[in-house]
Amino acid sequence: MNTAIVYISSDSYVMQTGTSIYSLFENNMHIKKMDTYVISTGISERNKKKLRDIAFRFQRKLDIIDEEKLIEKYEFGGGG
C-alpha cells in the first residue's frame, strides 16, 4: 500500500511542519512506501533544507513544491 501525505506551509509555520514530519516518519517506520509532499507558500531555502534533512535522516522521500509552480501548471481561478 502506498501512503501519500501533503502539507502546506510557509516560513511562519515551518517549525510545526517539521515537527509533524519528524513524528510522522518516526512513528510510521513500518510503512514501506510513503510519498510526502510539502507545498511551500514562501519557505526559505534554509528551511527547505532542514525539512529535507529530516527526510534524509529517516531515509524517506520528501518533495517540496513551490506554490507558484502549481499555479503555473494548473489554471486555478473563479468563473467559467
PLM segments and residue spans:
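N-proximal low-complexity "stem/linker" segments adjacent to membrane-targeting elements
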Residues: 1-26
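A structural micro-motif
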Residues: 3, 34, 60-62
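Short secondary-structure transition/capping motifs
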Residues: 9, 13, 36, 40-41
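N-terminal cationic-hydrophobic initiation segments that often serve targeting/anchoring roles
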Residues: 25-29, 55-56
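Short loop->beta transition adjacent to catalytic acidic/histidine clusters or analogous donor-positioning motifs
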Residues: 28-37
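Active-site-proximal specificity loops/subdomain of glycosyltransferases
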Residues: 40-80
